[in-house]
Amino acid sequence: EEHLWECKQLGVYSPFVLLNTLMFFNTKFFGLQTADEHMQLSFTNVVRQSRKCTTARGMTKVVSIRYCAPAKQKKGRDGTSGKRKREDEVPMLEQRENRMNPLRCPVKFYEFYLSKCPESLRNRNDVFYLQPERSCIAESPLWYSVIPMDRSMLESMLNRILAVREIYEEHSRLSGLEDDMD
């Protein structure tokens, strides 16, 4: 992971690098491992949230990005889809802000991405990763077109990300925390 930051493969150096960074964080913290899972992300199910929490130092504001993953239908014995029993079965995944290193903060990258996307798409429930504009420069107000990133490009980006060891370490750590909570 450190190598990707140092080689400027992660960051905000270009529209493609920003997309790569978002996909990296979505893989690392949301545990998305396939192109299909990434294609389920949308501007309406990935949202910025802030809430107040009590800490040893008192009240503090915690900012995060939350992803409300689609519920997986379980098949009943008769082969039909069972209904969701409880609302809390819908997985809610989170990426918290990185106050220790704001230059690697998932929330800041998400906010920057939104600012570079066409406003008309920010309420869409069928797209998240957009194709970069062909002729944009860093100072351009928009970096992305209204065209969704195609599957083959997503798969290519994802294959590079899945080669990073820390992706699996973070996902294992988060899974272990969830198991401890049960």
Model-predicted segments: where are they?
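Extended, non-catalytic subsegments within catalytic or DNA/protein-binding/adaptor domains
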Residues: 1-182
